Each structure stands twice: as C-alpha cells, then as structure tokens.
C-alpha cells in the first residue's frame, strides 16, 4: 500500500513546491467555513497549508454536499489540474478550522511549468 492516500504525491518533490509557495506566495488567513475555491469558479491559487485543515466538497444533483477529500497543515491545496488549466472547479474547498495558507497564483505556476 502506498505511503500516501494520493500516491501521485510520492512522485512530486514536495520540498521544492513548499519552498516555492513560502518564498513566492502570500500568506493569507481564512476563517473557518470560508471557501479557498468555490465550485463553478476557476481556482486562483495553489496553496501550502501552514496551519489548519480544509475539506473538498462536491455536490450531488439535488445539492447534497459530499466530502471527498481533506488537506491538513504541511500539505498542498488546489483544484488540480483545473487551476493550472483555468477550468472551473467541480468542487469547493472549504476551511474546517481557521487556516493560514501560502498562496501562489495558479497562472504563475502554469507559466513556470511551460
């Protein structure tokens, strides 16, 4: 069994991306219950969670919310690949407690990857 639930993360140099977020990003505070990304909008940031926790929520056709993922301090948060390709998110990412997140514009990250 992989060491991470999302096994792709084992193939990414997370130290590099953490350093990018901390050196290039803006530290933003989000109160509990605030959206990092709202379903139906394009995610503006890729973030490194300095403190706090967030949940990924998708909605069924009747509007019922379903938690499909979680992020905690020391992890990354974004709608991948939607944020990089400027596509509308199918889910919301919502803080479950107050959070401090280093936010890097997803447009800048996409430019650096080309």
Where in the sequence are the language-model features?
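Cyclic nucleotide-binding regulatory module and flanking cytosolic helices
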Residues: 1-31, 81-82
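Well-ordered beta-strand positions
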Residues: 29, 47-48, 94
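Glycine- and acidic-residue-biased ligand/ion/polar-headgroup-sensing regions
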Residues: 33, 44-57, 73-74
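Short phosphate-coordinating micro-motif centered on Lys-Gly-acidic
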Residues: 36-41
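Cytochrome P450 core scaffold surrounding the K-helix E-X-X-R motif
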Residues: 57-63
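Cyclic-nucleotide recognition modules
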Residues: 67-114
């Amino acid at each position: 069994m992989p060491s991470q639930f999302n096994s792709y993360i084992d193939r990414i140099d997370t130290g590099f991306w953490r350093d990018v977020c901390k050196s290039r990003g803006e530290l933003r505070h989000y109160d509990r219950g605030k959206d990092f990304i709202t379903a139906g909008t394009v995610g503006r940031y890729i973030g490194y969670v300095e403190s706090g926790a967030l949940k990924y929520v998708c909605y069924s056709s009747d509007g019922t919310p379903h938690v499909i993922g979680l992020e905690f301090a020391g992890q990354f948060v974004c709608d991948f690949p939607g944020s990089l390709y400027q596509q509308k998110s199918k889910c919301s990412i919502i803080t479950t407690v107050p959070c401090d997140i280093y936010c890097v514009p997803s447009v800048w990250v996409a430019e650096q990857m080309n």
